[in-house]
Amino acid sequence: MGAPATAASGGGDDDDRDVVFEYLLCTEEDAASAGSFFQQLQGPAPAVSSSPSTTTATAPAAAGSCDDGGEEEEEEVWTVDVVAELIGGEAERSHSPRADYPGRLRSGRPADLAARADSVAWILKVRELYGMLPVTAYLAVSYMDRFLSLHRLPGNGWAMQLLAVTCLSLAAKMEETLVPSILDLQMEDARYIFEHRTIFRMELLVLDALDWRLRSITPFTFMYLFADKVDPNGKHIRELIHQATQVTLATIHDTEFLDHCPSSIAAAAVLCASSEIMQLVSIDHGTLVSWRIIGLDEEAIIRCYRLMQQLISSNNVGRESTEITMATTTTTATTAVSSEEVVSSSPPSKRRKM
């Protein structure tokens, strides 16, 4: 068994945190035989199979697969105080990766950046396969980044896949009405198949690292609000939400957007969508000031907007993500707004755990 994984620099309580991990993960069986699950991440993959044996399964019905990311409107009145409180809540680092994480990720080992990119792509594929809400994929990547900002996983391949599966499982439990089984989640391009117990233990590890704070503020929290500001008559709301959702999903590939808060990403995405659909909004500081939203960082939104325009116009992975997700939701644009359930088609055959 290898040495414990190295925690991210700057975390004074990381040693205590690892002790908590060991306590949580050893209570379900004798500590002498269980050992440290976090240490096991250094070694061979536990309880996995690369068997060619296959079985078929039908993807469960998506729970309200709507382009607004699952933040369904219930005649909510957006008061100045409510919006200001939401924007103020973004400053809580407990719901975001460590402030130094984006820089460390971009300047660190290329393998870490590549592993994150692979995990993001996998999460988006599974989200597409099961018709999950956009916010589910966004939260899964957010949980993954928050965990990685605190702990560095070994470069053995399977540990990162285990983290991605775990974060998507947690996000699905938070947002989806019908959650695919652990085995079904791993059917899409999975190199390893993990047992339910392994995923459960990793969930405890992630939950403790995130201080059990899973209900996070996301760009989808603000999507309808900003769309209403751009199109108060509601003539283009469906298209605005649909296009802004695709842009937002594309941003999770690009680590540059880790430097931007959810409200800035949401506002910039809506403005990008409006420039494509309506061609009416002139993007400048005055436009954003006219929204009269307390706490909104107009300059940050303009920077994020320009970055998004580069992302959309380029041929990088972000654009590919937009094209993939566009294909997914084109056929459900109408049902997205009406929040009707959409049943996914049966997925292809998959491997099963031996």
UniProtKB/Swiss-Prot annotation:
Assigned GO CC terms: cyclin-dependent protein kinase holoenzyme complex; cytoplasm; nucleus
Any GO MF annotation of the entry: cyclin-dependent protein serine/threonine kinase regulator activity
Stored InterPro entries: Cyclin, Cyclin-like_dom, Cyclin-like_sf, Cyclin_C-dom, Cyclin_N, Cyclins_cyclin-box
Family matches, as Pfam families: Cyclin_C (PF02984), Cyclin_N (PF00134)
Example GO BP: G1/S transition of mitotic cell cycle
Compositional bias per record (Low complexity), positions renumbered to this chain: 44-66, 331-346
Chain segments carrying region Disordered: 37-74, 331-354
Domain of life from the UniProt record: Eukaryota
Record has Acetylation as a keyword: no
Alphabetical keyword list: Cell cycle, Cell division, Cyclin
Disulphide bond pairs: none
Family statement: Belongs to the cyclin family. Cyclin D subfamily.
Protein name: Cyclin-D1-2
